[in-house]
Amino acid sequence: MKKIIALLLALVMVLGLVACGAEKPAETKAPETQAPAAQNPEVTEAPAPMDVTLKVWAPSEDQNPELGEWLITMCNQFNEMHPEWNITFEYGVCTESDAKKLVPQDMEAAADVFLYSSTNLEVLTSSNALAEFGGTYLETVQNNYPQSMVDCVIYDGGVYGVPMTTNTYFMYYDKSVFTEEDVKSLDVMLEKGKVAFPLANGFYNAAFYLANGATFFGEDGTDREAGIQLGGEKGTAVTHALIDYVANPNFIVAEPADAIAMMREGNCDAYVCGTWQAAQTQEILGENFGVAMLPCATIDGQSMQLRPFTSAKCIGVKSTTQYPEVALKLALWLGGYESQKAHYELRGYIPCELKLMSEVQDDIVCRIDAQTITEIAVPRYSFAEFSFFWTPAESMGLEIRDGVVTHENAAEKTEAFNQACNNSGI
């Protein structure tokens, strides 16, 4: 009996333990974490755009609505690209050649960004009118343009602008009047049609003197002491040739703007100009639009290749601009891929930005421009003394046109012309 009672007690104890083990354990909750207080840092508003006023000068054609308002269009795009600035542009008319005079004479009133000719670089730098490019601005110029164009904005080792386009000239002609073979000879052309040449303009009439060995500051254009040499027997021979050409009724003395008007009226079959009138000329001639390098001319009984000048049109920044960062970036924009592309499409300006140059090789104007620069053109360097040439050259051209210069006084007139080209006239 005692054994039975002991067994019953043991069984009760086991059942009690089992019952206790089956109880649901207390829930272990993750400690309640209070939601962190909302982070409310002070809201930092974007800084207000900095107000900037920039004066920008360019030729009237670049601001003409009928020609696409290149300058205004590209400046507006630049403004939109830079929300950090609120730019007010003040536009003025100034040709590339006039910049050398208008900028230095009143630096306070002058444009912050302006177009200039590389031939005037010495004048502008010697008057401290141009800002020198450095840092990333300098690298952009060095890396995105042909070296020949970079050289155009270098003076005394510094870079003073952005190349915008080449500046040379060639011949536009009507293919229904002249063949590709005809346009190699001025004499042949004059037998078949009317040819306009801007004889009263040194930029163009120098082509005849250069054809017969004239030099501007030495053979390579870098010898200041050599001066301008277009006199002597060779220079006189050119003057005689020009007298004969002017006597030909098919040789028309006319500036490009007048020549294209005459072509539109059917009174001119070929004329000399640069890229800036390509689109209008193509519109006039249609499928008969022809482009060629300058022809050969007969000088002293020999066929001589006419040789044009070449240089660059550039974009500069005033050295005293109140907003150098904005002005430098605008100059790079106006000379960069997008702006050069727009200039090419609107006005036929030949690109000199490397990437864009590779994209326009199918354009005959671009090809002839490149061929001209490579094969026959003579570089114009930036010596200030070059400026002595223009007025005497204009006068010489006018006097030949008007018959003041004759075969009888050609030698005397040519020598006087040469002396005037080497004298400031002061």
Segment roles from a protein language model:
Residues 160-164, 169, 187-228, 268:
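Extracytoplasmic/periplasmic solute-binding protein
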Residues 347-352, 366-423:
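C-terminal capping/gating helix-and-loop segments adjacent to ligand/active sites or protein-protein/ligand interfaces
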Residues 104, 109-112, 139-173, 194-198, ...:
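A structural signal for short loop-to-beta-strand junctions that line the ligand-binding cleft
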Residues 224-255:
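Glycine-centered hinge/linker elements that transmit conformational signals in sensory
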Residues 46, 118-170, 181, 292-293, ...:
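Hinge/lid segment of periplasmic solute-binding proteins
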Residues 77, 81-144, 160-161, 269-270, ...:
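Extracytoplasmic "Venus flytrap"/periplasmic binding protein-like
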Residues 6, 20-120, 298, 419-426:
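Conserved N-terminal structural module of periplasmic/extracytoplasmic solute-binding proteins
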Residues 57-59, 114, 246-323:
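Extracytoplasmic/periplasmic substrate-binding proteins
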